[in-house]
């Protein structure tokens, strides 16, 4: 702040010296053009100095009005509508400071937004990756369990069919042998009774076949019940996993809300910092005004000593 003000004051003093030198050259030319008619009278010089002093006082009033203005637009309009060395310099300094502060704030805000976005993106990708891996593991385990159950059911079914076939053949052959042995021992009971025995044997075979079919159906039902129980257990596990996923999603949503809240807090901090920078700019303008006023007062006090040195050569 102090270094910048010293540069500004140096520029102001250089401009004043340059203006004084130009005025001295003008007066020298006027003296030469008068062709020995003498120097300007002290009255004319005093008028010139008074005009210059009035010009400076007018510019100081404009600067005072700029500092007491209620808004930035009003200040800029005052500086634009009243041209002058001091006003132009103050306007250029103010615009430069505003541009630098705005650029710094924009860069800081972009960096913070970029950092928050990258962090949020990385966390989201990590969560998606974990969810995909867990889903693949569950699908693979479910497929493996299903294949194992299918193989086990096929093995049990083939064994049951083989056992039933062997049992049916053994029973059929035993009944047939007993009937033939009874006929051979006691003789033929007659054609009628022989037909009755054949019919009874046929009915017994039908009943046995029905019992076998019902047994097979009962075994299938038992297998289906076991399968349903297994599927029910898998369903409960899937529901539990879904509940775990729901809890994780809620945690992720709360994390996202927390990140959003932190972003809003950072935005508020940036706004407060912007207001503080504007306040510092106003204080800087007030200090610049006081410094210029003090320098102009000092230059006004030394003006009478400058007049004789410029007139004496003639």
Swiss-Prot record:
Coiled coil: 106-291
Subcellular location as annotated: Cytoplasm, Cytoskeleton, Spindle; Midbody
Flavoprotein in keyword set: no
Compositionally biased tracts (Low complexity): 1-12
Record-level GO cellular component terms: cytoplasm; midbody; nucleus; spindle midzone
Taxonomy, superkingdom: Eukaryota
Lipid-substituted positions (N-myristoyl glycine): 2
GO molecular function: microtubule binding
Keyword Hydrolase: no
Region (Disordered): 1-43, 114-133
Comp. bias (Basic and acidic residues): 20-43, 120-133
Keywords: Coiled coil, Cytoplasm, Cytoskeleton, Lipoprotein, Myristate
GO terms for biological process, alphabetical: spindle midzone assembly
TM helices/strands, residue ranges: none
Principal localisation: cytoplasm
Biological function: May act as a scaffold to regulate the recruitment and assembly of spindle midzone components.
Sequence similarity: Belongs to the CCDC69 family.
PANTHER family noted in UniProt: COILED-COIL DOMAIN-CONTAINING PROTEIN 69, TOUCAN, ISOFORM A
Name used for this protein in its record: Coiled-coil domain-containing protein 69
Organism name: Danio rerio (Zebrafish)
